């Protein structure tokens, strides 16, 4: 969020859904949107949606595999999500992607849903005089915050002409006893939590610097990004539209 914009309006960083909606409304002006949310029917939009669904005790299936998407809790979560678009608190299109902190730095919006992939760029902007802050996703009043954890993987195709060389590269970068390269990848090339707990343990101080410390603090509230069939994601994508 743009800390200066919130301070000018006398708004504290939101902690609850109602505070988030109120802040988005107050921060929306003729020159700036209150918040950036993804608008297109994409996997990234669903990635942003899952925590809001979970925080209202909604889900696609229950533990026994029964469909629960039609329950009231899902409707309540959708009713919260929809007005941000309907009331034009967020833009209907973006020059920068919804995953880019440029939307805050360039004054497109005062708040944005984002993740660890924004940290390095946000801290560079702050060095240049911006005042970008971060807080956990707001949650319904009286309920615990939840976020979503995604990730990226490298794999080698069995059809590759250089299977052994490609596999050697992956292990050199991410699986070696020398953790120099995986540490640089996770903290300099981008910011992400490595799958290897040993890498985190060896670099505790790096994960407690600046904005990283805030993400590390609520790391345990993350749930893995769910993997559903294309039929399910297509229906959910249409529902959000």
Task: Give a label for each model feature.
Residues 1-13, 38-63, 148-156, 232-240:
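Periplasmic solute-binding protein
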Residues 5-6, 25-26, 98-112, 238:
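Short helices/loops that flank or line small-molecule/ion binding pockets
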Residues 8-13, 63-66, 82-96, 108, ...:
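A local structural motif
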Residues 15-22, 92-106:
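Short helix-initiation/N-cap motifs at beta->coil->alpha
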Residues 18-67, 82, 109:
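Extracytoplasmic/periplasmic solute-binding protein
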Residues 23-28, 64-94, 137:
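Glycine-centered hinge/linker elements that transmit conformational signals in sensory
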Residues 110-115, 133:
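Paired acidic/hydrophobic, glycine-rich loop segments that form the ligand-binding mouth/hinge
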Residues 117-129, 140-238:
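C-terminal lobe and pocket-closing loops
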């Amino acid at each position: 969020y743009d800390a200066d914009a919130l301070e000018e309006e006398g708004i504290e960083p939101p902690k609850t859904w109602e505070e988030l909606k109120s802040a988005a409304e107050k921060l929306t002006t003729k020159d700036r949107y209150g918040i950036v949310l993804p608008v297109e029917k994409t996997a990234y939009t669903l990635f942003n949606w899952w925590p809001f669904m979970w925080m209202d005790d909604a889900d696609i299936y229950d533990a026994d595999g029964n469909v629960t998407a039609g329950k009231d809790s899902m409707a309540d979560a959708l009713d919260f999500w929809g007005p941000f678009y309907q009331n034009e608190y967020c833009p209907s299109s973006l020059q920068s992607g919804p995953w880019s902190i440029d939307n805050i730095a360039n004054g497109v919006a005062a708040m944005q849903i984002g993740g660890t992939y924004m940290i390095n760029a946000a801290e560079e902007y702050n060095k240049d005089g911006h005042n970008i802050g971060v807080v956990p996703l707001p949650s319904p009043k009286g309920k615990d915050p939840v976020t979503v954890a995604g990730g990226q993987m490298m794999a080698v195709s069995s059809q590759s002409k250089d299977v052994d060389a490609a596999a050697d590269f992956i292990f050199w970068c991410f699986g070696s006893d020398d953790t120099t390269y995986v540490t640089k990848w996770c903290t300099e090339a981008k910011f992400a939590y490595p799958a290897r707990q040993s890498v985190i343990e060896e670099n505790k101080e790096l994960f407690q610097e600046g904005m990283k410390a805030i993400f590390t603090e609520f790391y345990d509230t993350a749930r893995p990004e769910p993997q559903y069939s294309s039929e399910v994601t297509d229906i959910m994508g249409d529902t959000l539209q």
